[in-house]
């Protein structure tokens, strides 16, 4: 529907669902947006637009009401579209977008397991990826591995310190910065097997130890991601990029200059607050240097659009990276940076206590173990990524309707249970018409068929929370319909079961796009 109206008006059209369903299936204030441009009153514009839809068989009624346009879809359109969706479940809500997109997300340092901050960005990125792929975009999910720099050296030191204290039983003085957590134990033991005990005491071999250990940490990270149904197409390692350093610096031209034995990028010329150091006086590259080479490599691969998902603490970093893209000769408008905000975790209303094995962070794997992958994914997709998120684990462990993921999954299971109780065959149900439904059934069908609009809107706006909001609303409509309407044994049993199948398809498709399982059976919730 959005696409039809977008084509008609040559712009994005805001669609609203009227609170009073008697007004129609949806409404739009487009006439108010056009009033200034056309120098006419919204009422007159709305009247003219309504008249232009008179011969359109998609709508049974298009009305102008005080400048608003109210649309009611025709019974034939809804019935035919619903039947088509059930006959073509694999293509329901799909499109054929042509744009080629590179989506980079997570990109956590290979120095320790993922924590809940990483988890939020991971779920956000993977949900965007799933939405884009469903819409037909040629999208690649990429992980940038920051395996160069001080943080890697610190990994080697941390393994040595852990091993000396816990394996050699030495008295160890810890520095101000180091990594901690039980994940270091297997790394220390494996290091001894590979290199011998001396690897724990030889400070000159910290780098060697770290470069070996990072692969083990990446396996931990990949396992954590796989346990939440998150997978990547490509991994790019920072350590492989610096062979291209001289060529990339030459491409930067006047964007790079030397001062006080340092190399700077003239990012202030491109909107940044200041120029930034890319190579220190001791010839060590900064974090930005790796990002410059990486983004050059990205753009040389020829995608149409590039999306980075970063932690909110990287907000100030956007301008300098976009400046480097401009100096490299590319259009920085093709680079979109989305931010993922902080997460606060409660358990029974109290701040969540970190486990001793995790060090000083709350591990993603701990939360998955406690509430499951489905609940974790739902939580992190349920609020705008650039706003702070606080949630209580206890709420998502409840097996009742107060738990939104249980509520949605139970709606799907309820549909399966109702259909299983019927004596009608699958073919008898599928051959039924979806016409001549009463108002409540008609609105439930409309709600189920809204999924394609929601999927496109959630991706284009980058607001993936619109999908779980929709699924929760659809589940509520289904549960209400179940209590208000008798189905089995009625004259309309076949068509009502077909309607429930359509709702089930939307629930299952929507949950799959969130990386969540649609349950076929669940124990009865406490209502």
From Swiss-Prot:
Pfam family of the protein (one):
DALR_1
Position of sequence motif 'HIGH' region: 108-118
Q: Name the Enzyme Commission number(s) assigned to this protein.
A: 6.1.1.19
A single Gene Ontology biological process assigned to it is: arginyl-tRNA aminoacylation
Tell me yes or no: is Aminoacyl-tRNA synthetase among this UniProt entry's keywords.
yes
Named from the GO MF annotations, one term is: ATP binding
* The UniProt record lists the keyword Ligase: yes
Q: Where in the cell is it found?
A: Cytoplasm
Q: Which reaction does it catalyse?
A: tRNA(Arg) + L-arginine + ATP = L-arginyl-tRNA(Arg) + AMP + diphosphate
Record's GO cellular component terms: cytoplasm
Where this protein primarily resides, as one coarse class? cytoplasm
The alphabetical list of record keywords is: Aminoacyl-tRNA synthetase, ATP-binding, Cytoplasm, Ligase, Nucleotide-binding, Protein biosynthesis
Q: Hey, which family's this protein in?
A: Belongs to the class-I aminoacyl-tRNA synthetase family.
Subunit arrangement? Monomer.
Protein known as: Arginine--tRNA ligase
